[in-house]
């Protein structure tokens, strides 16, 4: 479900927030930490008072009220950066189970939707069944801090911690993507990051959007795309992305280097407000330390060293097109508290937390990597694909046509209808592919790694034909797309996996414009 908090000056309602101890708690919170006694846990400290750190602190204190829990936050109480936070329905369900009163407080101020909208070249394409939630970051922090303080957590603002204080039974590091503690422990954690080539800038606007909306605009400099969603009655998040060439051609690189630390790039905000004037209704873009950056995907093979657990952006990030770092950090916090509950020692709890949560985050990062690759190259897709096919391509960045059909059958049927209208009434996988030999191909007979053989014809790498295989899925499919744009027949070779519906994947790749012909390879043979 979608959640949004509105009034900037809102304070949590006392009847909900102030009497946590007298209200029924979630079933697992009512129990103790099991064999991990309060004495063994001793003192808990959390470095970082963002949503992940506050959630961890409140859950640990609430479950074990005699344990001292202290949060150190470097910023003052009312300062925050950014605009809104997006949650999935699954995240909200997890929060409801862990902290039902907090969930209720947020939901009561919700802005909900499940339809995602694309705007490009004068057309609008919508796909439903995408349940999410969004909230103003300042309001989220107000709710979480009130909860934490009310259950007995000590929150110290304006506390810049340079060294981890000794003596705690458990330390939770939730100090964000620029964590100095992660950097110091990088070798033990096996921490690394990769940086994208494309540019993005995080803004706000008073323009109203009904739900998650993606406007795309072609300019003389190149194509700009935006992620927009409401976070309150009068405020929306507005994130703009473009490739490096577009950023430079628009002259946005010159303004970036002149900005002082912490300032917003007002020149870029003005340029982008003009670019997206139609979607913004002529309203300006608002800054809050809004600067151009390149997205960094952070990973770590370990999240624990000694009695220190790292959560959130300090050890993992995923591109915001598939999920927010805030929601991932809060999910980490819930998982950490649950691990402490069921394990017989702090070391065992930290190992369980690390093992279980790393696998969950790995899966999300794989999806995010594919989506990030799409956002690195969306400009050429915008210019070369018809709007309906661009929409299919966009919505199948990380899922298949079959997945979308379960969410919104009408969206997929509309795309198939356009396909049939342009292919003589053929369904996607029954559409013949004409060859120079005069043969109409519907199904590949055999693929031996270099040649796709059908009765009466062979397709191999040659002028006019491109067989694309190996490399990562995102790179492979992007190369096939480019081959099509260059006027070649793109034969996309995909690995055959038992869990994959081959017809569903083939239809996805063809209907989205990624390939003309799809072969599935298992030990060099079609399966």
Regions found by a protein language model. Name each.
Residues 61-81:
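Glycine-rich FAD pyrophosphate-binding loop
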Residues 46-62, 203, 291-370:
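Conserved mid-domain beta->alpha element of the FAD-binding
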Residues 52, 77, 178:
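Conserved Rossmann-like nucleotide-cofactor binding loop
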Residues 25-28, 34-40, 338-464:
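C-terminal helical "tail/cap" subdomain of flavin- and related membrane-associated enzymes
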Residues 127-130, 212-294:
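Conserved FAD/dinucleotide-binding core of flavoprotein oxidoreductases
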Residues 37-41, 88-202, 421-428:
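Conserved N-terminal helical subregion
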Residues 7-10, 14-43, 62-66, 433-462, ...:
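Extreme N-terminal leader/targeting segments of oxidoreductases
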Residues 76-94:
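Conserved N-terminal glycine-rich FAD pyrophosphate-binding loop of Rossmann-like flavoproteins
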């Amino acid at each position: 479900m979608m959640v949004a908090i509105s009034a900037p000056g809102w304070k949590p309602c006392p009847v909900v927030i102030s009497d946590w101890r007298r209200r029924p708690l979630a079933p697992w919170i009512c129990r103790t930490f099991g064999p991990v006694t309060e004495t063994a846990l001793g003192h808990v400290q959390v470095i970082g008072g963002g949503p992940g750190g506050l959630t961890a602190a409140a859950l640990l204190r609430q479950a074990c009220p005699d344990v001292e829990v202290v949060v150190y936050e470097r910023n003052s109480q009312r300062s925050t950066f950014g605009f809104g936070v997006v949650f999935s329905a699954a995240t909200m369900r997890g929060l409801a189970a862990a902290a039902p009163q907090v969930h209720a407080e947020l939901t009561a101020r919700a802005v909900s939707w499940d339809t995602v909208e694309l705007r490009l070249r004068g057309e609008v394409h919508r796909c439903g069944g995408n349940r999410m939630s969004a909230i103003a970051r300042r309001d989220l922090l107000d709710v979480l801090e009130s909860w934490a303080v009310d259950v007995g957590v000590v929150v110290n603002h304006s506390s810049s911690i340079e060294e981890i204080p000794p003596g705690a039974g458990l330390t939770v590091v939730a100090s964000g993507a620029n964590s100095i503690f992660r950097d110091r422990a990088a070798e033990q954690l096996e921490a690394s990051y990769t940086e994208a080539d494309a540019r993005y800038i995080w803004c706000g606007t008073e323009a109203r959007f009904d739900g998650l909306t993606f406007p795309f605009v072609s300019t003389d400099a190149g194509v700009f795309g935006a992620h927009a969603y409401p976070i309150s009655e009068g405020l929306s998040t507005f994130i703009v992305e473009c490739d490096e060439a577009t950023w430079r051609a628009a002259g946005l690189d010159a303004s970036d280097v002149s900005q002082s630390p912490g300032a917003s790039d007002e020149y870029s905000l003005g340029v982008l407000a003009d670019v997206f004037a139609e979607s913004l209704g002529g309203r300006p873009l608002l800054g809050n330390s809004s600067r151009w950056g390149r997205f960094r995907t952070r990973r770590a093979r370990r999240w624990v060293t000694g009695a220190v657990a790292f959560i959130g952006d300090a050890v993992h990030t995923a591109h915001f097109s598939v999920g927010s770092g805030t929601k991932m950090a809060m999910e980490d916090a819930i998982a950490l508290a649950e691990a402490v509950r069921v394990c017989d020692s702090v070391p065992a709890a930290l190992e369980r937390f690390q093992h279980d949560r790393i696998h969950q985050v790995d899966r999300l990062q794989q999806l995010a990597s594919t989506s990030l690759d799409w956002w690195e190259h969306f400009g050429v897709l915008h210019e070369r694909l018809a709007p309906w096919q661009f929409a299919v391509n966009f919505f199948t960045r990380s899922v298949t046509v079959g997945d979308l059909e379960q969410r919104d059958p009408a969206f997929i049927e509309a795309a198939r209808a356009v396909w049939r209208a342009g292919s003589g009434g053929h369904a996607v996988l029954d559409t013949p592919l004409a060859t120079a030999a005069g043969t109409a191909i519907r199904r590949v007979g055999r693929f031996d790694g270099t040649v796709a053989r059908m009765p009466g014809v062979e397709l191999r790498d040659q002028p006019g034909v491109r067989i694309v295989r190996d490399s990562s899925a995102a790179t492979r499919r992007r190369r096939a797309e480019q081959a099509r744009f260059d006027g070649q027949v793109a034969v996309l070779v995909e690995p055959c996996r038992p869990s994959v519906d081959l017809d569903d994947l083939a239809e996805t790749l063809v209907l989205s414009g990624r390939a003309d012909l799809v072969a599935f390879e298992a030990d060099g043979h079609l399966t």
